[in-house]
Amino acid sequence: MGTNQTQISDEYVTGNSSGVGGGISDVYGEDSATLDQLVTPWVTSVASGYTLMRDPRYNKGLAFTDKERDAHYITGLLPPVVLSQDVQERKVMHNLRQYTVPLQRYMALMDLQERNERLFYKLLIDNVEELLPVVYTPTVGEACQKYGSIYRRPQGLYISLKEKGKILEVLKNWPQRGIQVIVVTDGERILGLGDLGCQGMGIPVGKLSLYTALGGIRPSACLPITIDVGTNNEKLLNNEFYIGLKQKRANGEEYAEFLQEFMCAVKQNYGEKVLVQFEDFANHHAFELLSKYCSSHLVFNDDIQGTASVVLAGLIAAQKVLGKSLADHTFLFLGAGEAGTGIAELIALKISKETGKPIDETRKKIWLVDSKGLIVSERKESLQHFKQPWAHDHKPVKELLAAVNAIKPTVLIGTSGVGKTFTKEVVEAMATLNEKPLILALSNPTSQAECTAEEAYTWTKGRAIFASGSPFDPVQYDGKKFTPGQANNCYIFPGLGLGLIMSGAIRVRDDMLLAASEALASQVTEENFANGLIYPPFANIRKISANIAASVGAKTYELGLASNLPRPKDLVKMAESCMYSPVYRNFR
């Protein structure tokens, strides 16, 4: 071969077939190798040093040693200094903190991910509390709105109506074969921002970066997908920079057939055990897809099930503060879409299992308000099917404040996607009814939150137990510091995904979501409670995810839905051993 190239041999494949690092075959020996063992960084059958530096999986930037530079023909292509990964991390964080605009930070991080994958994930893991609002909510919402303008390089797989009849061929274009997790969106309901069409790709990309950083699933096992069936957003259709199909959304039979082809192709290409997470689909499609495919595929809807699980975890944890069981509470929701009804159903299921009462009876303690007012029996015939179980006997009530005074809830939960709907009068009414009102303003992004942390603490005179969907800064009130909790799905889905992969699950069941909720609630300490928190700090997220994965895995084995046999003796250790490490490897 030429002097500037390296010949690859078939002997490079190492590691056992079961694999670690997120449950896929360890093709490059990167995770089965200890940190001081050498791995071979070949990208293609013949790779030059120049190519090596431009592959984000293997690029180490200025961390290539002199020996590695000589061996892989990099000498002279980099400045002479050799920097450790820790120094590189400090440098990048210093540069990120110079940006005052969150979107600029987001773009800088995405650029890093496309240049140096391991440094990106090390940065995210070590600085999760600071960077989580950048790579995900709330900043990712703005990134999706402006995705056409900031688009640089393709991330993920785009499957549009133009590919109808050949989706399997498109899936085979993706270079990685051992896919374990797919996050897919059709962009119709991105956060609280509505129909962003093809520009919703930022959501699957962001979610999967968190599957890796927080749950330890290997980046090469993750596949972000956007299904482009058009958009009804006129601004995007008239925007010359829009990157998707410029046509109205397909619906009805055309939509159903396209999704059917997609789901069949996924199963055919990646097998029975690939986890498909539906993300930010509109209500009418989200419930239908989950119901249709839950018995034939390993599917999960984060908006319905992930949100439900994380909220239930907060409610379980809050029992220690309030001294009440879930069955003692009365719940009132503002918002009766995917999130609201999903949370309500999981709460009802948990109470049913605790009390032995039928779920139809436990639902009666849970009330929902939609855009037309309180959901009551006389509205049942006109309600969408997923709202009908929540239509209880009561006279019609139009306004939220009137509903609070009529129902007298102990817990107020906002999933409306409409900001400032928990008004001063509503929050003060909750404080009048309860010594410690539990208020969850869950809508994302921050601008769509039903109320702010400061408003909740001020209007209840510091008595509220508060959590939100997007982050809020600590609040000083009456000489005391209150730290608002964040009911972020990121607590649940990375550990849940790892648990499903680790056990070789073939289906997702509600009992697994309950197990995840209980595992998360168990991680809240007395110190957290003293600071007003009902969720643990994100700084411990990998430990939290390992515990959730172990609980989900245990439940999967218990239900007979696990295929990785025999069951490991210590599931927590198994989860920790499966986690991807972003530390640089030494190359031969």
UniProtKB/Swiss-Prot annotation:
Keyword ATP-binding in annotation: no
Lineage, top ranks: Eukaryota, Viridiplantae, Streptophyta, Embryophyta, Tracheophyta
GO cellular component terms, A-Z: cytosol; plastid
Residues at which NADP(+) binds: 189, 303, 332-348, 444
Primary location recorded for the protein, binned into one broad class: cytoplasm
Assembly description: Homohexamers and homooctamers.
Family: Belongs to the malic enzymes family.
Annotated site residue numbers, Important for activity: 303
Tissues where this protein is expressed: Mostly expressed in flowers, and, to a lower extent, in stems. In leaves and stems, restricted to the trichomes and trichome basal cells. Also present in the stipules flanking the base of the inflorescence bract leaves and in the meristematic zone of developing lateral roots. In flowers, present in pollen and the abscission zone of developing siliques.
One Pfam family cited in the UniProt record for this chain: Malic_M
Cofactor note: Divalent metal cations. Prefers magnesium or manganese.
GO molecular function: malate dehydrogenase (decarboxylating) (NADP+) activity; metal ion binding; NAD binding; oxaloacetate decarboxylase activity
Annotated protein name in UniProt: NADP-dependent malic enzyme 3
pH curve summary: Optimum pH is 7.7.
Keywords (A to Z) from UniProt: Acetylation, Cytoplasm, Metal-binding, NADP, Oxidoreductase
